[in-house]
A protein has these predicted regions:
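Glycine-rich FAD pyrophosphate-binding loop
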Residues: 47-69
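Extreme N-terminal leader/targeting segments of oxidoreductases
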Residues: 2-30, 48
């Protein structure tokens, strides 16, 4: 990978309420800002290559932001707009999760998901989700009628009219996933700097 430019990072260090410091972190091929699940996953992927990479996190550990407070659902991919990057990554990430859980030893359960429709007039919305999912490449999507839905989930409301069933959806432990990704990236050579906040980016001439 060719280094296209240099970035000087102005950072703030938080160490027991000490005075704010300004520091140059040095030269890297890639700087990743944030050690949440997206940052950790990016770091792990980059650790496969001959790239000098560093993850900068303003908190004291990984998984201290949005990644610690989410629904833990591994979505099937029917909700993202057709043809979007989100749709592509959602479906691909879903397909990767089972093997990742085995490789990195974090809990994952493929238990499927249901989008329940309570009224017949809502069926066009359910059908739209189904069509979008098929277009996005989601496998095994089905629309269940009320009888099929009751057989699958006896505790569902009697008002349920139909449901979109996505068997490829699942749940994961977001903490263990984030930590496992970061640990693996670090073992493979990616550096992590905590208690460090990026406050500005200034491009400078290479030379």
């Amino acid at each position: 990978m060719r280094l296209l430019g240099r970035l000087f990072f102005i950072i703030r260090k938080f160490r027991k309420k000490k005075q704010l410091l300004r520091s140059d972190l040095g030269m890297y091929d890639v700087i990743i800002i944030g050690a949440g699940v997206s940052g950790a996953a990016t770091a792990r992927e980059l650790s496969r290559y001959k790239v000098k990479a560093c993850v900068i996190e303003k908190e004291e550990d990984v998984c201290c932001g949005t990644s610690k407070a989410n629904s833990a659902i591994v979505h099937a991919g029917y909700d993202a707009a057709e043809g979007s990057l989100m749709a592509k990554l959602n479906v691909k990430g879903n397909q990767m999760m089972e093997q990742l859980s085995k490789d990195l030893d974090f809990p994952f359960k493929k238990n499927g998901s249901l989008v329940v429709c309570l009224h017949e007039e809502d069926m066009p919305n359910l059908q739209a989700l189904y069509d979008r999912g098929v277009a996005n490449g989601v496998k095994e999507l089905r629309i269940l009628n009320c009888k099929e839905l009751k057989e699958m989930e006896p505790n569902i409301s009697d008002q349920a009219y139909a449901a979109l069933y996505a068997p490829t959806a699942g749940i994961v432990c977001p903490f263990n996933l984030n930590i496992a990704m970061a640990e693996n990236a670090n073992v493979n050579g990616v550096e992590f700097k905590f208690d460090t906040e990026v406050t500005d980016l200034k491009p400078i001439d290479e030379g």
